[in-house]
Amino acid sequence: MKKYFFPLAIVACTALLNTSCSSSSTEPPVPQEYEGDLPKPTYSEQAVSFEIASDNVKDKSGKASLKAINFTESGKAIFEVKTTAGTKFVTYGATIDGDIYIVTDANGREIGRLRKLTSRAADDVTIEGTITVTINGVEYTFTISTKATSTSVPPTAVSRNTNNLARTWQVASMNVVLSGDIDLSKLVVGGNLKEFADAAQEAGANLNAEEMKALSKVVNSMTFNKNGLLSIEYSDASSDGCNWLWASGEKQEYIRLLQRNGAEFGNKFLSDRSVVKVDFTPTSVALTMKTDIRGSKNYSATLTVVLK
């Protein structure tokens, strides 16, 4: 069945900290409240999600199933794949031409395309095509010919803040303040999480090997869509996926982060109970979150990520 997803029904979100870092300790500029409309992304009218209820779309090995494809407002294709290691996400570039969806890698090379077929009688959507995606160095080739639930959100059906947030953002900076048993204030430029992890470790955070590994990535971008999905895209071509939800009332100042289909997300400084403050400017958005850390050291972490 094809359905239209409206603001009250938007689903929920995960994994956000995976953002940026650099060196100065100068406080970042605080965005002023902005209540205007940001320019519409290229595919704000054509963005769509295809969800596959069954596990019948498997890769050639039979070990992975394609569960969903989200074609976003900014021209991204976010794939949700069920593997033997759990639910994984990977993000590519996309071009939408009517009912044809072309997927490209970081070099602009086509890695597959889909065609959408709609039955007037039953209002069913069928997607067909062949696509090869790579997750953690493993290639999965899916030959697709299946019914799917098609979900689209017309820009007129959602709030201004949802339209403003739903796009791909580049990480500009991250400012972190640790207070309590650990005292640290660090502004980082770009998406290198390791800079932040190293600074926290030097300040006595006692991060273990697993926690340091989770903070070893470089974030290139973040993609929000109007269906409530967030993708965090790393420099190694991997992605994390989660759902997002407005946590406040009509003013929509906060989003809540929640897990999506059992996919792992977050790290030492982010939990699935995180609530994120959202502040827009005419050219950027600042996301601010606070996490209480309890363990061998007890402290609070306040993180402000600026996306442009």
Q: PLM ranges: what are they?
A:
Residues 1-8:
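Bacterial N-terminal signal peptides that target proteins for export
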Residues 49-74, 171-227, 257, 261:
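Short, solvent-exposed loop/hinge segments that bridge or flank secondary-structure elements
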Residues 72-126, 206-293, 299:
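Contiguous, well-ordered beta-strand patches that form the walls/edges
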Residues 17-20:
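C-terminal motif of bacterial Sec signal peptides marking the signal peptidase cleavage site
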Residues 299-308:
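Short, low-complexity, Pro/Ser/Thr/Gly-rich segments in the mature regions of secreted, periplasmic
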